[in-house]
């Protein structure tokens, strides 16, 4: 069985959409489950502050990916790349505006080629990882037998672009920029109902602040301690530049399963339903699923029982 150690490869002479040449570009990844080329392969793309460690004791999606889980490591080889520049492997990109979501998708496709992977049994991506996956299939329409984008879409809408713009303003702050950006982002990842139901305007008497205030401070501090602002700026740039073309979507040859969240503010449910309608009306083999939750975008990480049930019917 394949280890989950961090592995590295190099992409030679990679030119970004903006025309910037990188002669020797690093890409890191992890394997989980069966030895490569001995079982069907599933690629999982991580979310904005995630990484390649998708399974195992500290795996960010260990409720779905594991031995005996819905994505069963006894049956599959799971691969997960780090978005280049996310810092998990120590690599950062200073000139983050050189890159778009399409560039990262192209790097992932080249990374698969480097590993000798010509076909995936499934391509799964949550949030921005799913958006990068859309761009991957526009580059390589026959890459995956099954495509499962979760809480995501193939484009940066005006709403999402506006959120990214606010993030940029906050990241330019001189005082605690990453902490501020994370606090704002958390309000986009959850919903008013979720926070109101959880905190009920209760005070933390010891700190003399609302418990909701303390919760936001906690999330800001935690990310500030474990994530680098260079990585966050890059990820926000990628989120702002998702731009798969509808004509390219129609070339995708996968069985497509769109999974939305009914209360999502980040990638709203109606946008995912519109994408489903477009693909269905154009004869694509597409299915629509929806997680019911008050928790908004983060429900794709929180409502694991619902997601397990949906994925169980696909795998």
Q: Where on the chain are the PLM-derived regions?
A:
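Short beta-strand/loop motif that positions the catalytic acidic residue
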Residues: 252, 258-260
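Conserved hydrolase catalytic core segment
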Residues: 119-158
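Conserved acidic catalytic loop of the alpha/beta-hydrolase fold
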Residues: 102-121
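Alpha/beta-hydrolase-fold enzymes
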Residues: 143-222
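Catalytic-loop region of hydrolases
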Residues: 1-41
